[in-house]
Each structure stands twice: as C-alpha cells, then as structure tokens.
C-alpha cells in the first residue's frame, strides 16, 4: 500500500518551535517528563487541566445520564414495567458491543427486581436489529415490552409493527439515526440530531450503562452499576469508538476491575487464553479477548457468548468457554480458506487485480468472516474489495475500503445501474444483497462508479508518527503507560527508528502474510520485530533464505511477558517500513512467481543446484498440487507457457505427482512436459522442456 509518513515532532515542521514551548510549559505545569508532555501535545492536549484530566480521569468525566434525550421517558417506562411486574425482553446485537450490552442490562435490571429475558438474533438467519418474526414470537410468549440495545434506531417498520400489536418499545442505540425516527416510546441515542448530550462517542454498551445508572438513581437498592464496568470496557474497546471523555474513564475503570475481580465468565475466558489478569490492557482485550466473544455471533449463535457473560455456574461457564474457543478456531479456518481461495481467483484472473475495485464471489462463503477477509484484501491491494457469498438465486456481500474511498458514495453512484437489491453501512465498511446472476454487472457498475467519482485517484495510507527515536530509557514505558487505555482517537505512541539492521526473518500466517525478525538499532537496541499483514511489501525478498538488510521502521513498543514467568522482553510492532540498502537483484529467487506463497518449498527446491543454475535467468511459475484446484492450475500453466515461462510443479509424493501429471498431460502437449518417476533432471532436459514435475 502507498503510504505517507507524518512526523509530529519534526524539527523541520514550521510549528515545531511553538509545539516545543507548549510541551515545556505543560511539563512544568503538570509535573511530567518532557517526553510525556511531547506525547500529550502530539495528541492535541496543551492545557494543563485537560492534561491532568486525561492522565487521571475521574467521575468529573461522567455526565448526568438525564442530559440524554428521552432518558427520563425510558426510565419512567421501565419503572412502570417493574411496578406492574411485567416481562421485559432485551433485544441485542450479535457483535461484542451488542452481547456485552445485553449482558449488562440483563444482570443489572434483574438485580434491581425486573423480570427480564434476552434475545440476540442470528446473523445468518435474521440479520441485524429487530424483525417481525421475533416480535411476533415475543407477543406469543407474553412479552409486551421490548428494550433494544446497540440497535433499533433504524427499525422504523418493525417498531411500527410492534406498536400496532400494543407493545412498549424502548430503543437504546448509538448508530447514526435516519431522518425518520421510529415511533418507539423512547429513543435513547446521543447521536440524535435533537440530543444535546455533551459526548456523542459512546458505544452501545456505554448508552446501556447510562440507562442502568439512571434507573438505579430512581430505585432504593444496594446494586452498584460499576460492579459490571468490566463489561462496559470490553464492549467499548471492541466497537472501536473514541477512547476519550466518558469512554476513557469507563475503559480505565473496567480494566482495573478485570485485573482484580472480573465477572466469572470473563475470568474463565482469560484463564483459558493463558493471559495473566494483571497484564490486561486495551490491546489484549481488542486482539485476544474480544475476537473470542465475537466468534459466537460470526459462526453460530451469539447467545453462547451471552450465556458465558451472565453465568455463575462453573460447569456452564467451562462449557461455554470451550464452545467459544472451538468457534474461534472454526472462524480462523473459514477465514483462511476464503482468503486463500480469493488470492487464487485473483492470481488466475490478473485483470481483477488491475481493476479499481476488486469484486470476488464464491459458492456459499461463510457470511460471518466475509468482512474480515475483505479487510485483509483491501489492505493488501490498497483498493475497495467486495466479496459475495452466492447461492443459486441470491448473493450477500461485504465490502471494505481503504481511507479516502467512501463506500456509501460509491454504492449510491453504482445503484443507478440497478445492481443492488439493498445496501447499507459506513464509509469504509458496508453490506449489500444482489441477485446471483448480477455479479458481473456489479463488478462493471462499481468500477464505472469509481471512475466517475475518483478518476485515477489511488488511495494512500497516512502513518502518524509521534517522533523519531534511537533508544529507550528507564521511565520510557512508565510515561507511555500513563496514556492508556489505547484505541481509536488515542492510539499507541508511534516511533520512527532509522536505519536499523534486521535479520533472522520468519514468515507466517495465511499465505505467509506476516513476518517476524530480529532488529538492532544504531544505538544497539535489540528486540523482536513483528509485521502483521506487511509481508507483501517484502515482494521477492520473501523467497530469500538469508535476508539481511537495513530498514527505516515505524511502529509501537510493547513489553511482553512469558506465560507463567517473570521474564519480560521487548517487542516492536511494525506499522510500516522502508527497506534501505538492499539490491533486489541479489535475491535468491527473484524470478519465481507462485500461485500462493510456497516459501519453504522454494527454498528446498533451491538446494537442487541443477534447477537453480539453469532456471535462474528465466521467469518461473511454481505450483503445489494439494493447495490449488486443478482447473486453476491448468489455467495458470497455460498462461505461463503463453508468456514463455518455465513451469515447475511440486508434489509432496510420487503418487500425488503421478496423478497431477495424468491430468495436466491431458490438456498440455506432452512433448513440452518432463516427468520422471525418479525425478532425475539434467541441464539438457531443463533447456528443452517447459513443464517440470518435481518431488521434494
């Protein structure tokens, strides 16, 4: 991906002198190090009181819940329901924010004497938010009252139906409301245009927490809503809302509670993941805990995650933790399967990669992982990506885009070609449905729309860098820790390290998309380096068994501990890099092109000198039969031969190779193929033949 580096503390920046004055004043007024004051100024914090509040958020960050529009109405309706001892159903969403919201209100309201049940719709069968079938089911079960969490503000027709049935509907949500609001009894959403609540960035679970505290203020009870603040922290972090104002306080208090006494289900999940409670950070919640909770809604039934979070029964908790781990493993496998298949489709059809918008489809792709795969492909190719799961009649799709390309604008422009049955979403993430026979039309339409809106514009990724750094010091990590929790609108401090020596590369992940290495800075700072999703930038270097080079690197420092040990080690998580003094012509396998990344196989075959000596000057395509469909392989072989490339087909055994040969030779002229059961190859064979079968 194209990237631009923006260094805040750049001595050549025209604002550098003024920023430095602000930092030094902050340093004196607040009593912090100059390093920490510089990090604060880089985040736009120059006022001493604002800095103190940011570093030590307290209850002064928390606003009166009754400042929110319709909060009084919602609380009054709930008190009436409680007084009449009527049943109340909490209708949630299947993501982490929705599940934690439902769990929070279920536990909190029941503690205060409400008769509540919870309902979370199926992602695959029901989709997002309220639906008439569920409403009908509630009425049949004598639930006359619905309380939505993290959804509902767009459910205009569904809420109208519920009201026609005589039901009470209270909406709590944080998504952008439509012009026409539903006819609910109360709509609590800080993003309402007529809402003057001071902070608009609450997650769904944050809005639910405000409702819970408001109800508690009207009831004589020993229940403390902050006893469930760990749920608020997890949902807020997972939903990627700004970690500012109230959110910052809620998340910090929630992490403190997780470290001391988390709810039973959360504690069991943390233990199963072999995470030390005292080491919990917002990053650990975002990348290790939240995905496991999310796996339930993605792959099966989000109610599994809900049951884990509300349960006190050890046996039930253990069962649900096990289910989440299995579902997450299944999610990873499905994600890998679709990701590699998508790469293979692009490889066989290079014109897809050349288009401004990549559109791919597959039979019954799992809807729960399409968004994740689309995100990875969008980052890989720096383009909008639309993935469609199709059956005989229809297709459901997920789209992701790099910054600078608005999917909603793109879809609105493309909709004039009548390809969408429906679509919705945000600037960088969207969903849609089409007729399955319209996939080619969709591809043409969105690319036309792109040209009309963006012409030849190529998106770029802007990397914000706090400052250049050469080494770390004793108070370095203590200062950084004071800025936590990190997340959206409060990112981890990002540092530039110039001209570091990097070696001992290892590639891992789907299609070998990530890499790890050892780094030594010019000041002899030695540490592990991790580059998630960055191996594509290595290009041909991925096939070099002895990578040894210098880089300018941008990333975040973290101190991590070995499980069940006091041993700590320093890691540097890369966001971007530039390779310095490396000549691509020195790469061992610069002429190799593969259908997917076969680094280990290529290095092993590279030890066969007779092959490398004779093919090093020509372009070579390589394939590993078990990993690629034969139709795909045949197409690629044909394309390679048309381009005058040699083709090496690698087999794990003679049996596999023999079977592959019998198929290939039915389509490719046998006179161009070299196959010998003993795999004996010499220079004469290599110079005369085009396709070679080799076992390892």
Residue map of PLM features:
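Terminal, basic amphipathic appendages of nucleotide-handling enzymes
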Residues: 1-32, 42, 46-57, 61, ...
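Hydrophobic helix-and-loop "lid/oligomerization" segment in the mid-to-C-terminal part
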Residues: 5-11, 16, 20-145, 164-166, ...
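Structural motif
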Residues: 43, 361-364, 623-628, 650-655, ...
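Short, ordered loop/turn segments at secondary-structure junctions
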Residues: 93-94, 121-124, 151-152, 174-177, ...
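Acidic, two-metal ion nucleic-acid-processing modules in DNA metabolism proteins
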Residues: 110, 248-291, 295-343, 400-407, ...
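Conserved phosphate-handling catalytic cores of large alpha/beta enzymes
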Residues: 138-141, 148, 152-241, 696
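Conserved motor-coupling elements within RecA-like helicase/translocase cores
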Residues: 659-694
């Amino acid at each position: 991906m194209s990237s631009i580096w923006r260094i805040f503390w750049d001595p050549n920046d025209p604002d550098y002198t003024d920023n430095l004055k602000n930092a030094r004043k902050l340093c004196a007024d607040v009593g912090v190090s100059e390093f920490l004051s510089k990090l604060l100024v880089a985040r736009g914090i120059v006022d001493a009181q604002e800095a103190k509040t940011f570093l030590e958020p307290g209850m002064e960050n928390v606003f009166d819940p009754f400042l929110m529009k319709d909060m009084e109405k919602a609380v009054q309706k709930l008190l009436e329901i409680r007084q009449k001892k009527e049943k109340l159903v909490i209708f949630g969403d299947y993501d982490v924010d929705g599940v934690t919201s439902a769990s929070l209100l279920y536990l909190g309201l029941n503690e205060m004497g409400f008769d509540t049940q919870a309902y979370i719709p199926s992602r695959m069968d029901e989709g997002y938010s309220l639906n008439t079938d569920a409403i009908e089911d509630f009425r049949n079960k004598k639930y006359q009252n619905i309380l939505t969490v993290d959804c509902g503000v767009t459910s205009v027709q569904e809420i109208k139906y519920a009201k026609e049935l005589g039901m009470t509907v209270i909406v709590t949500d944080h998504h952008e409301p439509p012009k026409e609001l539903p006819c609910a009894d109360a709509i609590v959403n800080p993003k309402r245009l007529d809402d003057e609540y001071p902070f608009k960035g609450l997650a769904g679970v944050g809005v639910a927490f405000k409702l819970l505290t408001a109800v508690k203020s009207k009831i004589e009870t020993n229940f403390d809503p902050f006893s469930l603040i760990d749920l608020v922290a997890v949902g807020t972090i997972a939903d990627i809302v700004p970690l500012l104002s109230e959110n910052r306080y809620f998340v910090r208090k929630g992490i403190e509670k997780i470290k001391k006494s988390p709810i039973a289900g959360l504690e069991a999940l943390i233990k199963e993941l072999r995470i030390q409670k005292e080491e919990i950070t917002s990053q650990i919640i975002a990348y290790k805990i939240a995905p496991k909770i999310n796996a339930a809604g993605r792959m099966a039934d989000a109610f599994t995650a809900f049951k884990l979070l509300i349960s006190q029964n050890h046996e039930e908790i253990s069962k649900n933790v096990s289910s989440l781990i299995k579902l997450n493993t299944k999610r990873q496998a499905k994600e890998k399967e679709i990701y590699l298949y998508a790469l293979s489709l692009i490889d066989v059809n290079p014109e897809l990669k050349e288009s401004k918008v990549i559109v791919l489809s597959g039979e019954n792709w799992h809807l729960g992982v399409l968004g994740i795969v689309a995100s990875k492909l969008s980052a890989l190719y720096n383009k909008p990506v639309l993935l469609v799961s199709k059956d005989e009649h229809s297709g459901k799709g997920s789209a992701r885009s790099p910054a600078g390309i608005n999917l909603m604008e793109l879809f609105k422009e493309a909709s004039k070609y009548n390809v969408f049955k429906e679509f919705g979403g945000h600037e960088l993430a969207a969903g849609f449905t089409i007729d399955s026979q319209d996939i080619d039309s969709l591809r043409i339409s969105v690319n036309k729309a792109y040209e009309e809106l963006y012409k030849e514009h190529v998106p770029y990724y802007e990397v914000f860098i706090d400052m250049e750094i050469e080494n770390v010091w004793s108070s370095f990590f203590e200062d950084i820790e004071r800025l936590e929790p990190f997340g959206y609108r409060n990112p981890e401090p990002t540092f530039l390290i110039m001209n570091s020596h990097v070696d001992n590369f290892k590639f891992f992940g789907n299609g070998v998309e990530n890499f790890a290495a050892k780094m030594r800075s010019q000041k002899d700072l030695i540490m592990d380096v991790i580059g998630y999703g960055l191996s594509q930038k290595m290009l041909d270097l991925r096939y070099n068994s002895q990578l040894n080079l210098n880089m300018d690197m941008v990333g975040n420092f973290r101190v991590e501990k070995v499980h069940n040990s006091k041993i700590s080690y320093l890691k540097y998580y890369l966001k971007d890099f530039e390779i310095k003094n490396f000549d691509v012509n020195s790469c061992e396998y610069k002429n190799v092109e593969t259908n997917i990344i076969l680094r280990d196989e290529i290095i092993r075959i590279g030890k066969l000198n007779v092959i490398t000596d004779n093919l090093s000057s020509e372009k070579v395509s390589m394939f590993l039969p078990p990993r690629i469909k034969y139709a795909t392989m045949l197409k690629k072989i044909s394309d390679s031969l048309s381009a005058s490339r040699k083709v090496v087909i690698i087999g794990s055994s003679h049996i596999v190779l023999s079977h592959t040969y019998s198929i290939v030779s039915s389509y490719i002229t046998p006179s161009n193929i070299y196959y010998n059961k003993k795999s004996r190859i010499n220079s004469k064979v290599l110079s005369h033949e085009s396709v070679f079968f080799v076992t390892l």
